Amino acid sequence: MRASPTPWLSRAEPYCQRESPMNLLTTTPAGDRYVTFNGIDFEGNMARVLAHLRRYIDDPRTGNAFWDRFKARLAAAESGGNAFQDKLLLLHSHVYYMGDLFEDQEDEAALADLRKLEEECF
């Protein structure tokens, strides 16, 4: 009898629950965000980064078509039923572009707030 080419399909337990190095960890990672997200100010972190961002993308000298599209998507995210999650996802998917913009403007405060948003919320 020939062995199945996909032996993981014949097991009763899902592939993700099988013994793996990640399943063998017994220590809790440092920082509460990996366990509960308790005490993290998601809204405040997002608001601070958006305030920095708006200074640049609303200014005709530093805004462009890319950021105009971002503003339209942000307005749609904020008006939807899942505004919190949609806004967080939108910021997450544009984090590198925001970082580039803040670096180009040499805005250290914006970069610090963006780093905090990345580390605590993404």
Curated annotation (Swiss-Prot):
UniProt keyword terms in alphabetical order: Nitrogen fixation
Superkingdom of origin: Bacteria
Nucleus recorded as keyword: no
Q: Which GO terms describe its biological process?
A: nitrogen fixation
What does this chain do? Is required to sustain N(2)-dependent growth in the presence of low levels of carbon monoxide (CO). Probably acts by protecting the N(2) fixation ability of the nitrogenase complex, which is inactivated in the presence of CO.
Similarity comment text for this entry: Belongs to the CowN family.
Protein name, entry field: N(2)-fixation sustaining protein CowN
Query: Which gene carries the instructions for this protein?
Result: cowN
